[in-house]
């Protein structure tokens, strides 16, 4: 069993359902501390955050990952227990295999080899791991970034191990992500008996025309890097459960995934304009999960492309799709951010898995990225 596969198996055995780490970070420390990496815990609340750094000089390269995983769901639906990793037909099965314990294993072994081959490398290397990515993300990377800023720590390059690949390892790299803006809207009406609508004010009926306008609005046309901004309603709640009561309040949860063509303020203003135009009595609160970011054709992107081509022969496609990642907290610092990891077809699903051969290939790609950036300086 290779070092990368061995570590991936050990990580998957830890039942680190968010926000638990379950000892995963200790496994990484055990492997990197002997190579000169200094470990520092930056924990907040129930979240464990680990900052491992080797060297103090610039430039600083950071591998970013998360040890927490989503719940496995019904255990009886799995072909093998989700936290008892099993290899079948060349695939490693287990919760977190692709998202993202396989990547963490590949990062770790890549760093081990790189430091052995280049003990006097220029710059510094670091690993940032959190146990709060799949959950609220309140006490994870966002808090660590604040600590690093207070120390004037500058991250030059950040490679996130999120599963970016689609059909083959390395066919897609993420060079950005859309922003995520959520809202909770409460339409206020007057409760009453369904037989006496003249004595009530139905918030569902009131909101229907506005909902139609919100869902058909063209928010922007996107650009060469991002698809058009999307608006989606995720939940609608109203009523008492009885069929003879007009509700007095309607609650709507919605989300925007937005491009660099729009600002948060512009979205908020347009939503409120639509609601006001329909004469609604409402309360509205917002939650910004992350701003859109984009890393153009910079050193990190070039180094990543070259490494993928050398190991797999592929020319990766740059993409900004998918959900949010912790890269959204690093990008505003000015760092170049790229996401590269295993195939994402099984993530968050029953029988999550990663190809065993992809683990070693990913580790080789990560090592080449380090060499492309640091070994030749």
UniProtKB/Swiss-Prot annotation:
Residues that hold Zn(2+) 1 according to the record: 66, 99, 162
Species lineage: Bacteria, Pseudomonadati, Pseudomonadota, Gammaproteobacteria, Methylococcales
Disulfide bonds: none
Binding site residues for Zn(2+) 2: 99, 134, 348
Domain of life, source organism: Bacteria
UniProt cross-references to SUPFAM superfamilies, sorted A to Z: Bacterial exopeptidase dimerisation domain, Zn-dependent exopeptidases
Entry protein name: Succinyl-diaminopimelate desuccinylase
CDD domains given in the database record: M20_DapE_proteobac
Pfam short name (any one): M20_dimer
Keyword Hydrolase (UniProt): yes
PROSITE patterns: ARGE_DAPE_CPG2_2 (PS00759)
Family matches, as InterPro entries: ArgE/DapE_CS, Bact_exopeptidase_dim_dom, DapE_proteobac, Peptidase_M20, Peptidase_M20_dimer, Peptidase_M20A
GO MF terms, alphabetically ordered: acetylornithine deacetylase activity; cobalt ion binding; succinyl-diaminopimelate desuccinylase activity; zinc ion binding
Enzyme Commission number(s): 3.5.1.18
Note describing how the cofactor binds: Binds 2 Zn(2+) or Co(2+) ions per subunit.
Source species: Methylococcus capsulatus (strain ATCC 33009 / NCIMB 11132 / Bath)
Active site (catalytic residues): 68, 133
Protein family (similarity comment): Belongs to the peptidase M20A family. DapE subfamily.
Gene (UniProt): dapE
Needed cofactors: Zn(2+); Co(2+)
Pathway(s) it belongs to: Amino-acid biosynthesis; L-lysine biosynthesis via DAP pathway; LL-2,6-diaminopimelate from (S)-tetrahydrodipicolinate (succinylase route): step 3/3
Enzyme class, first EC level, given as a word: hydrolase
Oligomeric form and interacting partners: Homodimer.
Keywords linked to the UniProt accession: Amino-acid biosynthesis, Cobalt, Diaminopimelate biosynthesis, Hydrolase, Lysine biosynthesis, Metal-binding, Zinc
């Amino acid at each position: 069993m290779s070092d990368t596969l061995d570590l991936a198996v050990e990580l998957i055995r830890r039942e680190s359902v968010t926000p638990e780490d379950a000892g995963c970070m200790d496994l990484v420390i055990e492997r990197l501390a002997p190579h000169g990496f200094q470990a520092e815990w930056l924990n907040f609340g129930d979240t464990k955050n680990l900052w491992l750094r080797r060297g103090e000089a610039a430039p600083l390269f950071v591998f970013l990952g998360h040890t927490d995983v989503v719940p496995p769901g019904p255990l009886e639906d799995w072909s093998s227990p989700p936290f008892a990793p099993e290899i079948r037909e060349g695939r490693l099965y287990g919760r977190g295999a692709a998202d993202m314990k396989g990547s963490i294993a590949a990062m770790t072994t890549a760093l081990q080899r790189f430091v052995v081959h280049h003990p006097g490398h220029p710059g510094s290397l670091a690993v940032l791991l959190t146990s709060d990515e799949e959950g609220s993300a309140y006490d994870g990377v966002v808090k660590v970034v604040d600590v690093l800023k207070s120390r004037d720590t500058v991250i030059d390059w950040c490679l996130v191990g999120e599963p970016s690949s689609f059909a083959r390892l390395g066919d897609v790299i993420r060079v950005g992500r859309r922003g995520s803006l959520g809202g909770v809207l409460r339409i206020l009406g007057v409760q009453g008996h369904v037989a006496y609508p003249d004595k009530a004010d139905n918030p569902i009926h009131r909101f229907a025309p506005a909902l139609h306008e919100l869902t058909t609005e063209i928010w922007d046309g996107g650009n060469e890097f991002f698809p058009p901004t999307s608006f989606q309603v995720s939940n609608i709640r109203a009523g008492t459960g009885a069929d003879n009561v007009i509700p007095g309040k309607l609650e709507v949860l919605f989300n925007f995934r937005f491009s660099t063509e729009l600002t948060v303020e512009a979205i908020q203003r347009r939503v409120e304009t639509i609601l006001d135009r329909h004469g609604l009595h409402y309360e509205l609160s917002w939650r910004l999960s992350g701003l859109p970011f984009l890393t153009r054709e910079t050193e990190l992107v070039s180094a990543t492309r070259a490494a993928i081509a050398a190991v797999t022969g592929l020319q990766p496609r740059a993409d900004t799709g998918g959900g949010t990642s912790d890269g959204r907290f690093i990008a505003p610092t000015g760092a170049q951010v790229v996401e590269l990891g295993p195939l994402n077809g099984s993530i968050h699903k029953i029988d999550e898995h990663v190809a065993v051969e992809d683990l070693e290939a990913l580790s080789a790609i990560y090592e080449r990225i380090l060499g492309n950036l640091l070994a030749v300086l």
